């Protein structure tokens, strides 16, 4: 997952609203959003190369999502970061205990941001800072850096999310995730990947021959605990592959 914007507002009619894009190489095998046969409490996509996932729902209102932190100068981790999301969704352990385990194991992974929560609390963990923070109500954004790093695409996506919060619908969340406008050269971050790649990665929705947005996900959680999750899948150059709509 490479871009997540979300509104966390406990006590509201919709306490959690999430719009997220997963960016990945098209050649990496994966499955779309579905109920997991071996863990029926989990609804998520699946990375078939390593077995984990990037965003999903579990029992008792559990939610988890992850973005990688871009740093080409650091070696890749020994373990797949997607197992951190899968682990939280498949296990029934308290959030504090799970975060303690994540903190202890973080050096085994490449850089990442992890969001985990339920109906009552939402936590963010940044592996570079090795600190877990309980989030107060607000509108937040994550890409391939720290929480709310003001990259152009994150600012655009957060602003677009704010405009639909009065009447959030999956289609409006998916629409904001389809923004393909690239940032001007002067506004690009420098993450060490070169100007051409920085430009490609600067849009909310990324499309190219080999790498791009593979899945766009909209999640709306209601105060009664019901959840509506919609995922669109894409192939090379942004070709639409399908859509999954799940109500829980």
Show where each model-derived region lies.
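N-terminal nucleophile
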Residues: 1-248
């Amino acid at each position: 997952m490479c871009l997540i914007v979300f509104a966390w507002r406990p006590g509201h009619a919709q306490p959690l609203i999430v719009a997220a894009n997963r960016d990945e190489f098209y050649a990496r095998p994966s499955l779309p959003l579905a109920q997991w046969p071996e863990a029926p409490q989990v609804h998520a996509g699946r990375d078939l190369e390593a077995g984990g996932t990037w965003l999903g729902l579990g029992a008792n209102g559990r939610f988890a999502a992850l973005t990688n932190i871009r740093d080409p100068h650091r070696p890749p981790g020994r373990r797949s970061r997607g197992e951190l999301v899968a682990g939280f969704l498949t296990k029934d352990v308290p959030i504090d205990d799970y975060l303690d385990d994540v903190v202890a194991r973080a050096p085994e992974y490449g850089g990442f941001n992890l969001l985990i929560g339920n109906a009552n609390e939402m936590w963010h963990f940044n592996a570079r800072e090795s600190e877990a923070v309980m989030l107060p109500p607000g509108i937040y954004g994550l890409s391939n850096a720290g929480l709310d790093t003001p990259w152009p695409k994150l600012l655009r996506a957060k602003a677009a999310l704010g405009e639909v919060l009065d009447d959030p619908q999956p289609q409006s969340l998916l629409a904001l995730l389809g923004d393909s406008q690239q940032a001007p050269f002067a506004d690009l971050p420098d993450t060490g990947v070169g100007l051409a790649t920085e430009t490609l990665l600067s849009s909310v929705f990324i499309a190219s021959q080999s790498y791009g947005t593979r899945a766009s996900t909209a999640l709306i959680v209601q105060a009664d605990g019901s959840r509506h999750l919609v995922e669109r899948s894409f192939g090379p150059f942004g070709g639409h592959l399908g859509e999954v709509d799940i109500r829980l």
